[in-house]
A protein has these predicted regions:
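Short, well-ordered beta-strand micro-motif
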Residues: 7, 83-85, 111-113
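A structural signal for short, well-ordered beta-strand segments
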Residues: 5, 58, 80-84
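Active-site-adjacent beta-strand/loop module that shapes the phosphate/pyrophosphate-binding cleft
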Residues: 66-95, 130
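Short connector loops at helix/strand junctions that flank enzyme active sites
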Residues: 8, 26, 53, 75-81, ...
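Short, solvent-exposed loop/turn segments at secondary-structure junctions
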Residues: 23-24, 62-68
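Nudix hydrolase/Nudix homology domain
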Residues: 19-24, 90-93, 97-145
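N-terminal strand-loop-strand
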Residues: 1-26, 54, 86
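The catalytic Nudix box helix
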Residues: 26-60
Length: 145
C-alpha cells in the first residue's frame, strides 16, 4: 500500500510531477515491509522534499481503482493520506515552483491554488473536491476511474 502527504499553505496544496508523468500527484510512496504508515510518510517526505515534517492527522484511507495513464496498467491501490505540518521547515523558502532530485529522479513541485485544481490534470481526482472540507478523523472511501 501507499501513503501520501497533503501539504497545505494559504489555500494551496503542494503537488509534484516527474519525468515519467504528464499529471500532478501528491508526495508520498510505498510503505516498506515492517514499516508503519506514519514512518513511511515521514521517510518519503524526507526523501522527496528534504525536510523533517510532522504529521497532523490521517485524513483518508482511499481504495483507488484505476488504469495508469502512461503505462495502461490496471491498479487497485490502497493509500492513506496524511495532513502534514511544514511550519518548522524551510519548504516555503523554495518558492511557488521548485525542482529537487531524489536519487536518479527529478521531481518538479508546485503550490497549486485550491480553486485551480478543477482544471488541473492531478491524481487522485477526489482531491479536487475534498480539499475544501478536510475531515477531522480518518475517512474510508473509494474512487473508481
Amino acid at each position: 500500500y501507499r501513503v501520501c502527504a497533503v501539504i497545505i499553505n494559504d489555500d494551496k496544496i503542494l503537488a509534484m510531477q516527474d519525468e515519467r508523468s504528464p499529471y500532478y500527484y501528491l508526495p508520498g510512496g510505498r510503505v516498506s515491509l515492517n514499516e508503519t504508515a506514519e514512518n513511511a510518510i515521514l521517510r518519503e517526505i524526507k526523501e522527496e522534499l528534504e525536510i523533517d515534517a510532522k504529521i497532523v492527522r490521517p485524513l483518508w484511507l482511499n481504495q483507488g481503482f484505476f488504469v495508469e495513464d502512461v503505462t495502461g496498467e490496471k491498479y487497485h491501490e490502497l493509500c492513506i493520506y496524511f495532513l502534514i505540518d511544514i511550519s518548522n521547515t524551510d519548504l516555503l523558502e523554495k518558492g511557488n515552483r521548485f525542482r529537487l532530485i531524489e536519487r536518479e529522479h527529478t521531481h518538479d513541485f508546485e503550490w497549486i491554488e485550491f480553486e485551480r485544481l478543477q482544471n488541473e490534470y492531478i491524481y487522485p481526482v477526489f482531491i479536487k473536491k475534498k480539499i475544501f472540507d478536510l475531515p477531522d478523523y480518518l475517512v474510508l472511501q473509494d474512487e473508481h476511474e
